[in-house]
Amino acid sequence: EAKKPCVHIEREDDPAKQVRRYGFTAGLKISVLSNFEHLYIYDTSYPVEQNDTRLKAIVREYKYTDYEDAAEELLEYLGKESVYSGHFDEVWSEIEANVNHKSVDELFLQQINNWRLMLGKEILNCNPEIEMEELGDVVQSYINKILFLRVCEDRNIETYQSLLQIADHNSYQELIAKFKAADSRYNSGLFEEKLSAEIIGNVSSSFWSIIRELYFPQSPYSFAVLSSDILGKIYEIFLSQRLAVVDGQLSIVNKPENEDRDIVTTPNFIVREILRQTMRDNLAHLTDEQILSLKCADIACGSGAFLLETFQILCDALVDFYTVNDKSKLIQTDVNTFKLKFEIKRNVLKSCIYGVDKDFNAVEACKFGLLLKLLEGEDDSTIASFHPVLPNLDDNIFYGNSLLESSDVPDNQVEEINPFDFGERKFHYIIGNPPYMKTEDIKVFTPKEHKLYPKRYKSAYKQYDKYFLFVERAFKLLKKDGAMGYIVPSKFMKVGAGRELRNYISSNKSIKAITSFGAHQIFSDKSTYSCIIILQNKENDSFTYSEVDSLAKWKVRDLTSFSENKRNISHLGKETWVLCSDRLQSILNHISTQSLPLGEIVGDDYIFNGIQTSANKEYIFQPESEDRQYYYFKYNKQLYQIEKKITKPYFKTVSGVDSLNTYRTFKPNARVIFPYKRRTDGKLDVIKLSTIQRKFPYFYNYLRVIKSELDRPDRDIKPAPTTANEWHRFGRHQSLEACEIAEKIIVGVLAQENKYAVDTNGT
């Protein structure tokens, strides 16, 4: 932030607060304030408070007389070479930790959730009959309205503090009038009435609180620099939760499909890299007409992170084209710096950007983010001639289930499943981070959809993951020569369930590139082995395979950070894909010529997965205590006891750590309830319920508690039960006999290193 020399930043507090608010809102480690005589570097990883002085959060300060002696230091802290080499991140790594722990998105999400509860409680008090789903929609709608107008104030599109004046007047009539005027001016559907007079008139106190919290000092943010991608991250987490009445109180709870897992957002560097590989490098060769004719989609768009960046890339490509060919289409903002005219940006959004999501609130959040993105860099003067200012995005961002079409769904399930018909629509580019969901979870959360997927998708094979289906669906929606870019777990290349997806991709010869991140963790607090896969709707003889060695260097495009190798597509098929760098490939080839597959030595029947209960929460426990006959354990916070003889030792990883060591024995760390008995021929049969009641009464009592979980219609048991009294069986029968073998070698699935532990406990 550069100030005139007459602004005394060396003694005034406001310039320091301003630059810190800008930096904090933008999610930056540091921000620089200078009036040319003085230069200050501020830590902007935590919010500004009203009584902060200019000295708060200052980490470096220089006077112009220091510049010569401090030149090397300044270049290290702020220099272009430092940033591009990645050294900048190392220099400010301590502050980076603060950014991650006290980030703007976490604080703002907490504030938005407080508003949801405050507004929701007052609306519920006035209208007790309102459905929870409608309540959530109405609350989100009003928060969007207020937030949109507040952002427009800081961007000089709306009069600054106009909302605050309404709050100070305590006039709900003025607020309704403001919304109506905004609806007339912007006309994007954002300001459509949702019970406005009824709600605003009765709960205006909540609106005044929300509005006041959007201004300093109650708000630490500068909405002029609140980027759409940061807002998108906030909404991505926001969308994983819903309003619900719990024990008589309105609360925010996870949506059912998110109850047992963390919601992660796609890092910006991954979004940008997928778009670079999929489309950006091609745009330099296109004319403006060709760029404006592109159709780009995310068919599981969420809050729109990929679409926001796609819109930006298309606008940047047009600026590059017009800078060389027709500067009359541009507005000059500085020396050799230009931006697109608003009309052309508007055209890009309406003509090129498309999205689908099965969550209605995600659709609304995506539209909201795109409209704010459209207004970035604009002010009242650049949009004054447009009426309405904003386009309606109802024909761009759709509410529906993109995996199923109407013809796939029985008539009596259409409303619940909400299939989306793409019709003749095809796309030049499809990008995204599709949902990851195991088959077991699909059965639990969307059992009706689960039955329909195998009819449409070849990749719906065995224990498939939902992202398999999205890869197949996206590829089918590409125009000729179109491209798809996704980040997905890399396990599809290895696991048996990925066999048909591998076959589908390889038989179409569609691979353009695969970037493997190996053990590098892309998503914070989430252990997932990820890769970027780029497919083209054309036949390729070869593809580029890359392995990332250093994630930090790869982020800044340091070519030494990854190996790039050409691979022949004909070498891939439905069997496991073994992909590695050229250096490792030669080692692997040497090992292969000197070795035999394990199956040839011990027999394929003796290589097996562990047991699959399909009810781990109910059947696997870690004892709280034990005596000679019983184990004591907790289930849903209640203490139970169970006969030791009906359990077996079990090993489970804890927080991703497997504690296995090669050639060493290990101790099981849990117990599994094992309701099976051995026959004379060595096979296992499930123990009848009547026998359990007689021989294992404590287990029988516990079974009665968990029956509702084990006997769910969507719980998949194979082979299918032959009687109504086999609901306590495991989900899969294979490997049960093998698991009783006294001595075994155990290796973790997708292990990062060679760990072959020895089991002597019958685990």
Regions found by a protein language model. Name each.
Residues 12-33, 38-96, 100, 156-158, ...:
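Signature of N6-adenine DNA methyltransferases within the class I
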Residues 38, 239, 301, 360, ...:
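Short, glycine-/Ser/Thr-/acidic-enriched flexible segments
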Residues 4, 30, 468, 475-476, ...:
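Polybasic, glycine- and aromatic-enriched phosphate-binding surface used to engage nucleic acids
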Residues 37, 75-315, 352-362, 400-405, ...:
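Preference for the N-terminal adenyl/adenosyl cofactor-binding alpha/beta module
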Residues 51, 159-168, 286-293, 314-348, ...:
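Flexible phosphate/Mg2+-sensing switch loops adjacent to catalytic phosphate-binding sites
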Residues 303-308, 312-315, 367-371, 701, ...:
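Phosphate-binding glycine-rich loops of NTP-binding sites
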Residues 129, 517-522, 732-734:
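Short, solvent-exposed loop/turn elements at beta->coil junctions and helix N-caps
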Residues 1-6, 22:
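Conserved catalytic cores of phosphodiester-cleaving nucleases, focusing on short active-site segments
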